[in-house]
């Protein structure tokens, strides 16, 4: 069994390296390599560049804007973005909501939300990851303040404290 990469796979690797050298800012790469905190703008800058290239949704099918890559291509891509010092791709919309919508969403939902995830217009978060609880749903605590005809509930969400969509 030959475990070497094929010439096409090596060419693909080189294409990724070349693209990263031109599209991953040194500022962001330096922050990643120095383990400095990245803000939303840093993630968004890189993810929008990947989206423009068509490389953001590596696990999505082509018909929904994904790459259609093989598992080997996905591996090569992940390996090269790590080597280059790229930020991780923020996964909630891409890896959690998107696949659920593709499987169970109606056409209107797919048409509206999937492109917004790919364009970084919408950022999704795991709504049950709270301070002091993590993903332990039984330990979640909040309060509801009565405002007459509605209540205000205070919740914190990991990686999206400044984001909301009503």
Label the model's feature ranges:
Residues 27-50:
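Short secondary-structure junction/hinge motifs that connect adjacent elements
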Residues 156-163:
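Conserved small/polar residues in nucleotide/adenosyl-binding loops
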Residues 44-47, 51-111, 115-121:
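Internal helix-loop-helix
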Residues 120-128:
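A short, Trp-centered hydrophobic/proline-enriched beta-strand micro-motif
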Residues 1-5:
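Intrinsic disorder at enzyme termini
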Residues 132-140:
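Active-site-adjacent elements of ketosynthase-type condensing enzymes
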């Amino acid at each position: 069994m030959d475990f070497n990469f094929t010439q096409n796979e090596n060419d693909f690797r080189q294409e990724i390296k070349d693209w990263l050298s031109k599209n991953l800012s040194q500022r962001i790469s330096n922050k990643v390599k120095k383990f400095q905190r990245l803000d939303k703008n840093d993630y968004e800058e890189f993810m929008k560049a990947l989206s423009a290239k068509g490389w953001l949704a590596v696990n999505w099918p082509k018909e929904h804007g994904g790459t259609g890559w093989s598992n080997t291509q996905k591996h090569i891509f992940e390996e090269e973005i790590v080597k280059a010092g790229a930020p991780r791709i923020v996964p909630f919309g891409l890896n959690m909501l998107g696949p659920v919508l593709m499987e169970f969403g109606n056409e209107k939902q797919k048409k509206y939300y999937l492109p917004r995830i790919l364009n970084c217009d919408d950022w999704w978060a795991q709504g049950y990851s709270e301070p002091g609880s993590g993903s332990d749903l039984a330990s979640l605590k909040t309060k509801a303040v009565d405002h007459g005809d509605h209540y205000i509930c205070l919740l914190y969400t990991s990686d999206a404290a400044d984001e909301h969509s009503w």
